[in-house]
Structure formats: structure tokens, C-alpha cells
């Protein structure tokens, strides 16, 4: 079993270290991650300069690019054999609902999926940052299940884990994405030198956290697993737009 690990928090992040440690007991693990925190990078590729690949003292590889760059480079230009699975994370923070559009964690897994590989994005909905081992054990459980019962087709899963000890989890729920309210406005700030700068505002609170959503599962201390797709087409609006053009 060969697993490629990546993330958007950077190769030095505790989440990916926890994941590499626990998965190394059952698989040949290669870590290729960004050299710095690239949270919010989404599915961006670096096209304006070449990428470089380096190996750190802990054996992890790092790239001067985005999470998507890391997976693309590893699968298409670095690894001698294709991985059996791509896993991205463990992200420090939730990737639920609208977060998935912005998330570099989800993007790294998405790139694996686009390259024809089963892929999982995993995030710890963290407050204490003390339960990365919980999320790592959930991933280990999923990988063991995959080894025993492989997917018939490549699949893309988004996993969110409550920030709790493993024994306090209330199970696993297969969910759909919820929705957030719009994000908070940017924060305007004056530097000591008189320059006006802006910080991106916080994500909006949950708008749709109804039963069956990832938000609802996490509110009830359950792990959320959401199968994702790439097709963004609103099929129910195709006829509406056609009629709008005729008018």
C-alpha cells in the first residue's frame, strides 16, 4: 500500500506529522507538502515560475508552491510508482460547507482525484489543537477499510473530525455539505508607518446546519464524511438560462 500525503498547513505542521506516523505502520508513506502555510490556496497552480523540491531533516519533501502543485508534482514527476491513495491533512481547522471552495487541504485531495486516484481530505475541527491523534486514528480506520474493500472507482472524500479524544466520538456520519453565511468584512488596519492594510475577515457562521449536513454531524460530536464531485453545473438552471437568453 502506497500513500501520498500532502496538506496546506506546510510540511512542518503537526497534523501531517501525526498522519505520517500512524500510517507508516501499514503503508509506504511519502510526504510532499508546501514549504509554508498555504491555507486558502484552493486549487491554484504555480505557472509563473519553476517549482523546486527539497527533502527536510525528517524525511518529508517540501515544494515552493501550492498544495495542488505538491500533489501534481509528486504524482506526475517525482514518484516512481503511483500511490494507491492520496490523503491531505490533517488540517488545523474545519473544512465544512463553503470552506471546501477555498481550502488548500481539499484542493490537494481534489488534485489526486483528478489524476485518477482515490483521495481523502481530513480536517480537525480544532479548538485545543490537542486531538490530532484522534483524526489520525480515524484516517487509519478508513485506510484499513480501503485495503480490505477498495473503491470500484476513484472517489473524493472530505472528512471533518471533532476536536475530542477518540473514545468520546459519537460515531461517523456520511453527510452533505452545509452552507455558511457570507464571510465577515475585511479588517482595515493602519501600520506604524501609516500604511493602510487589510486582513481577510473570518468565515461566516453556519447558515444550513440541518440534519444530514457536515455542520450538524460535528455539532453532535460525530465524524463527517462527505463524498465530493468536481462537476459544478447547476443542471436545474440550464433550462432557465436558455429561456433567459431567448427573452
UniProtKB/Swiss-Prot annotation:
<keyword id="KW-0547">Nucleotide-binding</keyword>
<keyword id="KW-0479">Metal-binding</keyword>
<dbReference type="InterPro" id="IPR036523">
    <property type="entry name" value="SurE-like_sf"/>
</dbReference>
<feature type="binding site">
    <location>
        <position position="9"/>
    </location>
    <ligand>
        <name>a divalent metal cation</name>
    </ligand>
</feature>
<dbReference type="InterPro" id="IPR030048">
    <property type="entry name" value="SurE"/>
</dbReference>
<comment type="function">
    <text>Nucleotidase that shows phosphatase activity on nucleoside 5'-monophosphates.</text>
</comment>
<keyword id="KW-0378">Hydrolase</keyword>
<comment type="similarity">
    <text>Belongs to the SurE nucleotidase family.</text>
</comment>
<protein>
    <recommendedName>
        <fullName>5'-nucleotidase SurE</fullName>
        <ecNumber>3.1.3.5</ecNumber>
    </recommendedName>
</protein>
<dbReference type="InterPro" id="IPR002828">
    <property type="entry name" value="SurE-like_Pase/nucleotidase"/>
</dbReference>
<keyword id="KW-0963">Cytoplasm</keyword>
<dbReference type="GO" id="GO:0008254">
    <property type="term" value="F:3'-nucleotidase activity"/>
</dbReference>
<dbReference type="GO" id="GO:0004309">
    <property type="term" value="F:exopolyphosphatase activity"/>
</dbReference>
<dbReference type="GO" id="GO:0000166">
    <property type="term" value="F:nucleotide binding"/>
</dbReference>
<dbReference type="GO" id="GO:0046872">
    <property type="term" value="F:metal ion binding"/>
</dbReference>
<dbReference type="GO" id="GO:0008253">
    <property type="term" value="F:5'-nucleotidase activity"/>
</dbReference>
<dbReference type="Pfam" id="PF01975">
    <property type="entry name" value="SurE"/>
</dbReference>
<feature type="binding site">
    <location>
        <position position="91"/>
    </location>
    <ligand>
        <name>a divalent metal cation</name>
    </ligand>
</feature>
<feature type="binding site">
    <location>
        <position position="39"/>
    </location>
    <ligand>
        <name>a divalent metal cation</name>
    </ligand>
</feature>
<feature type="binding site">
    <location>
        <position position="8"/>
    </location>
    <ligand>
        <name>a divalent metal cation</name>
    </ligand>
</feature>
<dbReference type="GO" id="GO:0005737">
    <property type="term" value="C:cytoplasm"/>
</dbReference>
